[in-house]
Amino acid sequence: LGAVSIAFIGMDHPEDMLLANNKYYTLAIVLIIYWLATFISLKGLSWVGKVAKIGGMVGTIIPAALLIILGIVYLATGGHSNMDFHSNFFPDFSKFDNLVLAASIFLFYAGMEMGGIHVKDVDNPSKNYPKAVFIGALITVVIFVLGTFALGIIIPEKDINLTQSLLVGFDNYFKYIHASWLSPIIAIALAFGVLAGVLTWVAGPSKGIFAVGKAGYLPPFFQKTNKIGVQKNILYIQGAAVTLLSLLFVVMPSVQSFYQILSQLTVILYLIMYMLMFSGAIALRYKMKKAGRPFRIGKGGNGLMWLIGGLGFCGSLLAFVLSFIPPSQISTGNNTVWFAVLFIGVIVVVAAPFIIYASKKASWVDPNTEFEPFHWEVKNDVSETNTTKA
């Protein structure tokens, strides 16, 4: 989206669309935005917080609200809808091809659980945090559903494009209200929003890896920081990995196909974690019956937990399986490349935590680490202490 937004800053939209479809241009912009986000992250969390806050408002919330309002105004003033709200309103889920794209819906909610790290900063978290999650999920549904309708209304079905439709939709609406001069402005805003989003993902996970490394799970090389305490080596390695992954642009047939395969890989990795979360929540009801739970699903018994956790697990499992199937709506090129990228990506990412956990060394532990031990490690320490005393 960042590359497309920058391409659409110009006023010659046919040329803008050609530029946005150029794989090498997109590769260059992706790397520029990512490394810019990396260098901003090296400035510390204060910089990250400021850019993310402003970018989230200017590049996400305001454009989303504007898009929905433009769609309402367009229909209210007699604009022609390119979207059929009758016979073809509901997709044909009997076709696997449609289910594959539907599986991407899980990505809309990805990261909702990340707010849990701030739960200690919330007043009365046992009540207010679940409320915040439900409200956030509702807002997400409203924005994505209404935003998608707004794009479907103004763009003919044959012209729908995974990477360009948002900018094309805004451009068409601005032409309708005779305000085409707003197109470059919204393109700049969206590009800034992309930078803010990338910045959040660059800084957040690397901070978590840094905390794990200081607990003795990574060599001292990964624990090195700059003058203000930012995990510089992890950020550089992370950037190098993204750079290598971006080279997929060269082997994929189009920008759309590259976007789709990365989206599918992201969905698959998220769903693996969600399946572990749902199954883990059920298992802990039996393995840690007496654990204190400020928030509990179901007042008594485990029936409601089985229902909610089971539905979540089954839905995630179905989407997980479907995500490996190439969609027919988008040319993904050689199926061998498609499956190879997905399977190798999953194997590497899933294997990494096990390798890191098995590699822990006492000599790697930073004395100032605040990393909490795993509960089974605490149990083992207690057992060893009791055995020694006996």
Name what the model sees in each region.
Residues G2-M11, A132-L199, L218-T266:
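TM-loop-TM module centered on a large, flexible mid-protein loop between adjacent transmembrane helices
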Residues F8-Y25, I54-A187:
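Helix-loop-helix junctions that connect adjacent transmembrane segments
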Residues N22-Y25, A37, V51-I54, K224-I228, ...:
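C-terminal membrane-solvent junction of multi-pass transporters and transport-like membrane proteins
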Residues Y25-T77, A110, V133-I139, S263, ...:
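Membrane-interface loop-to-helix entry segments
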Residues K43-I54, M112-G147, S206-I209, G213-I228, ...:
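Hydrophobic, small-residue-rich membrane helices and short re-entrant helix-turn-helix hairpins
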Residues Y109, M114-V122, S180-P220, I228, ...:
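Membrane-helix boundary/coupling elements in multi-pass transport proteins
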Residues A241-P253, G315-T332:
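Alpha-helical transmembrane segments and their membrane-interface junctions
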Residues F278-L307, P326-A390:
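Terminal cytosolic tails of multi-pass membrane transporters
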